Design a protein with these regions (language model features):
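Thiamine diphosphate
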Residues: 13-89
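Short hydrophobic/aromatic-rich motifs at helix boundaries and adjacent loops
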Residues: 9-13, 40, 96, 122-123
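Active-site-proximal loop->helix
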Residues: 65-70, 90-104
Length: 140
């Protein structure tokens, strides 16, 4: 596509850092959960660049929920790619905010029980209701 020179990726700590090995673009490593805030600043400073985040569920749906919702609410001109595997994948497969009901993890060996653990956080459905959000899609 020839857009490598015009693209900046923001990836936080965790599984997302592996993306550096596969895409030959400029990358910024963000503090855990802060990728949308960093991406917002980078885009405002470089309005002609394509800026995106690449985040796992521990980063986006746990520690970074506020940054994600507020970036969407402000209508920031960034793309957020959310890799949701339903667990904290890099630290041993623990239950994450997105772990599905009944899903077995290393910290809930009998499956997620909503009476004990609450409901899974449905990020796509949450941000699609935010007025500043432009486009939401779920892929598998």
């Amino acid at each position: 596509m020839g857009i490598e020179e015009e693209t900046i990726g923001i990836a936080p700590v965790g599984c997302a850092v592996f993306a550096y090995n596969y895409l030959d673009i400029d990358w910024i490593e963000a503090a855990h959960g802060r990728a949308p805030a960093i991406a917002s600043a980078v885009k405002r400073l470089n309005p002609k660049k394509m800026v995106f985040t690449y985040q796992g569920d521990g980063d986006l749906a746990a520690i970074g929920t506020a940054e994600t919702i507020h970036a969407c609410n402000r209508g920031e001109n960034i793309a957020i790619i959310f890799i949701n595997n339903g667990i904290y994948g890099m630290t041993g497969g623990q239950m994450a905010p997105t772990t599905l009901e009944g899903m077995v993890t290393s910290t809930c060996p009998y499956g997620r029980n909503v009476a004990l653990n609450g409901y899974p956080l449905r990020i796509a459905e949450l941000v699609e209701r935010v007025d500043g959000t432009c486009y939401v899609t779920r892929q598998s």
